[in-house]
Amino acid sequence: MADTAHINDVPMQGKGLYSSHAALQHEAMLKALPLLQQATNTVVTNVNRNLRPLTVVEYGSAHGNNSIQPMVTILDSTPPGDIQLVFSDRPENDFNTLSTTVTTWAEGLDKAKFPHSIFPAMIPRSFYRQVVPSRSADLGFSLAALHHLDHVPKSQDGVDHQALLKRQAHLDLLQFLKLRADEIVPGGSLVLSFVSQSSSGRENYAGLVDACRNAMIDMVKDGTLPGAVAGSFYVPTYNRTLQDVQKVIEEVIPTWIAHEVFEQDCLHPAKKDLELQKSSDDYDSDEASRRYADVVVDWLMAVCAGYFLKAVKVGSDNTFTGEDAEKFLADWVKRTKHFFYKDHRDEDVVCSFIFVRLERV
């Protein structure tokens, strides 16, 4: 594999595609709102800003669709005054969509309810680097992003690849917390949520993963997709366990106080919609099941599609055009929906998340 293949430089799908298919992330975000409220109360109580603006940084904003409610929750618990809201993501992110999302929201705020003077900013930088100046932030948060690794560790003879990913995930989270400790003032807070391994042993959205895998195998078997492309497809994530996270926190205890660290499952809301449809008079089970398959597969593809397009380039040494790659992708999506409907009809799409609330000492 070429060195460029190890770099995690693939953004979520742009032009609003990711933001249109981030419903499960939205469910996880809602579960993080009480932590953000508590974190904001801690900041308001602990931090003497000396007339400087309150600064809030989001690490991994994507298109901003799941950034707004957290920011509203923070504003709700913050006294009137100047507040800087920083939205950050990798340089490859679709910042045009993010800008539209943030600007539309900020300009439409009810000034009677939110008399704050709001100063939005966007920073194109990975959260595995320092994002804002040292001791300039009061509150930080990152939702549904930290399971994405900085890069894919290169294979080592005699070392299990999962062990390499586990080590990389440990180093990444440790680096993330050390960087945020530089940026966030003493008394400040940090709230995190990210995809995790369920302590029950249940695999996250197993049916979807199986359908994706079978669809790609099907494309290779019938000669549609080169095997080298399928072999190059990889999503550089690692789902940590609670124990993994606690080990990292133990290493930063002199700098951070951990107030809450817990695991919780999130169900894709399309399943609730499906159950509601079953009670309607004009319920068509086949149509409803196909629509459910469309929604949950589109959700997963909003994250995976960019990595698939990268695999087409890497696995073919750039012999395919962008149009070719998009055709491969459309075929893969179509087949994945077919396999999910056939083999996992109406199956729950559940994902485990870890939630963390930290205070900067």
Swiss-Prot record:
Q: Which UniProt keywords apply?
A: Magnesium, Metal-binding, Methyltransferase, S-adenosyl-L-methionine, Transferase
Extract the Gene3D superfamilies matched here.
Methyltransferase, alpha-helical capping domain (1.10.1200.270), Vaccinia Virus protein VP39 (3.40.50.150)
List the gene name. Answer: LUC1
A single GO molecular-function term is:
metal ion binding
| InterPro entries the record matches | MeTrfase_7 (IPR005299), MeTrfase_capping (IPR042086), SAM-dependent_MTases_sf (IPR029063)
Q: Which organism is it from?
A: Fusarium sp
Report residues binding Mg(2+): 156, 233
- Name of this chain's protein: Methyltransferase LUC1
Q: What happens when the gene is disrupted?
A: Abolishes the production of lucilactaene and NG-391, and leads to the accumulation of demethyllucilactaene and (8Z)-demethyllucilactaene.
Where S-adenosyl-L-homocysteine binds, per the record, is at: 18, 66, 89, 126-127
Q: What is its EC number?
A: 2.1.1.-
Q: Which family does it belong to?
A: Belongs to the methyltransferase superfamily. Type-7 methyltransferase family.
Give the record's GO biological process terms. methylation
